[in-house]
Amino acid sequence: SQPDTQTAEQDFLTRHPDAVVFSPKKRQWGTQDDLTCAQWLWKKIIALYEHAAECDGEVVRPKEPNWTAWANEIRLMCVQDGRTHKQICEMYNRVSRDPFWCRNVLSPSKLREKWDELSLRLSPSVSTYTEKREDPYFKASYD
């Protein structure tokens, strides 16, 4: 079984030479940039837990993530969804400052799943737009 595992890993690395974390069996992998982005997200999440623990002694630090799965999800956000690592980090910065979303987006997969909703809800321009906008149809119906 050992030679088969080594062969599978070598074949995988031949197909994905920039993979620094990978699981040939699960077909998951990530580049160094994907892993770095995943680790940055983890640091932000740990900071949220540490802040919560200051107020509530029952809060326990979560276990380390599966780095291959996290880096793979980051890679998919870049490759399939067209996001950059910078955009991913900027979005998570906004998420981490929101009282609701910081509790509900605690992984790259959840960030990816909720991206469209988050980009609208957490966009600074949306709250400004809805506050300043006057809808003539709405106003006319109540005048």
Where are the regions that the model predicts?
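Append "and, occasionally, other polyanion-binding protein interfaces
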Residues: S1-D143
